Amino acid sequence: MAQQQKKRKKRKSKKFPLYMKSKLVVFFGILLACLCALIGRIMYIEYHNGEEYKKLVLSKQDYDSKIIPYQRGDILDTNGTVLATSVAVYNIILDCKVLTSDEKYIEPTVTALLSCFPKKLKEEEIRKYIAEEQKRAYIILAKGLSYDEVQKFVKLQEEVDDKGKKKNPDINGVWFETEYKRSYPYKTLAADVIGFTSAGDVGTTGLEHYYDDVLNGINGREYGYLNSNSDYEKTVIAPEDGDSIVISIDENIQAIVEEKIAEFNEAYTNNKTKGPGAKNIAVVMQNPNTGEIIAMASYPTFDLSKPRDLSAYYTKKQIKKMSQEETYAALNEIWKNYCVTETYEPGSVQKPFTVACGLETGTVKQSDTFYCDGYEVFGPDKIHCFDRSGHGTETVEGALMDSCNDSLMQMSYQIGAEKFLEYQSIFGFGQKTGIDLPGEAYTASLIYTLDKIKPVDLATNSFGQNYNCTMVQMISAFYSLINGGTYYQPHMLKKIVDAKGNTVSTYSPVALKQTVSSSTSALIREYLYHTVTSGTATSAKVDGYSLGGKTGTAQKYPRAEKNYLVSFMGFAPYENPQFVIYCVIDTPNVEDQAHSSYALNLTREILKEVYPYMNIYPDEEKTGVNEGKDITGAVGHDDAQLQDENGDGSIQDNQIPEETPGQENRQNGQDSQGEQDEQDEQDDPDNPE
């Protein structure tokens, strides 16, 4: 027994051998190193990938989330006037989880909702949600409420007594979600230029469509979730608001132009036939030294706040009878931007280009003369001048001043088809201008090619018939004729600014090419100045102000209908042009359409107000010219005098061939419209020309 106890004692006092101690030290060292490495790795992940893993964890947990909407950028005019903006509106959100969590919340909350929003909410609908949707935390009861409407409920909910306690603590389970609604302060102003948005802030037409990616931002999001301890936590990702664009349109000039278009339309509504004053009326003003669009307007137009409202043009009965296709066609007719998407035969405003081509190529000399006997012969047919008795001998300048078709046809023979078509291309006809607006028409198939053009086509092209262009093509080419020869890309954008007002980028004018020499440009400018002072365009002049320009009268296709498009292209001041203005009146509602006086009168009435606004001062002695005239030009002139004064090469019956480039396409509704951009406005009816 004693011996056994002695053995146990020896066993208890036995110590670890040295090699075992060494192993333990190594083991614990490795364990400590692993622990340090693990801690280091965790710290590294937290620093570099913390947000990623946080989102992963959140995605596995029970949570609610809501979108925090961005604010779409504004559209501002050149002076900073807001033309389009986004205003906050509010949705009423019902949280049935909270509302039904305590029976005492239900009646006070329902009563408060119905008293504050009697026209927006129905009691039976609210009670149905409470009975059937008790687990839902997000139910939209009403959308698009104003701040003032919402405040009535908020004040009731937060009202306190003298002790600072809530008077209505049992109003629960209701909150307000912020959204943004597009607002257009000037409603109809520049409607086809600005455009509008559809649901989800998607730009549908105009600048809203073209600059959709710039104006739009990125939605934020708020996540609410229960963590492992069942505590409610949330994380917020802030929205990124869209950038704003500043455009070259001047709201004041735009308003003047639109007011005068409306005045003209009213003056001739129900004149010859029941209907508007013209099928289309359009005006573009541009800065010839930059290509900036100063104003762009057309009729018919629409209210940007109610873009699908046709009541201005149709009765309720007519609208009700419309098929879906007819409704779309009617809407697209008012949404279209005539200045950009529509093509037409320009008429005599082409003549300065023919003269410039001849002078620039040396095929026409300044000293050349032409004899106008009233017509040119092409086989069995005669192409007449508007003065069938003939102008007699004409100089180059006189041919422009008198708008002599016969002289221009003779010039085209000297120029030849190859040079003529070459300069059509140099001036940009048949090509897109690249203007920053959607739906620009593609016109390559609407002008002649060298292998297709015949002598009669060259002759009629020389005075603006038998080829098609757009207004923006014509005015962009024209200002290169009078600014020294520089063709600037037409544009709307001036700069982009972020939500804090910082400039993101600035647009600089782009000089694309030289169309004519400065000497040719100076001659054309002089010829057109005399066309206003002593030629066919006198009625456009505002007494005391210098002005140059050219009239246009084009017979529309089909010729047998005897419809006309009349126009005037002008610039001022003569010595140092600050703007170019182009007025087009398509099918005026008058007995005798073939007179440019309608476009001249509209131009003059616009310029009366534009000159003082632009700080352009009188630079000539007053002579009393056009004194007392209104937009109809009736005062001081009878109709016969006006027609004689403004007979600018109007096209006589049967003098223009029926076949034109792209005629088949136009009949099938092709090429006379802008390309099919992904927007509602591109289903417009076929151009009738």
What positions do the PLM features span?
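Beta-lactam-recognizing serine transpeptidase/beta-lactamase-like catalytic domain environment
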Residues: 82-85, 90, 229-236, 249, ...
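Hydrophobic alpha-helical positions that pack around
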Residues: 589
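Periplasmic/cell-envelope proteins involved in peptidoglycan metabolism and beta-lactam response
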Residues: 1-316, 418-425, 540-541, 559, ...
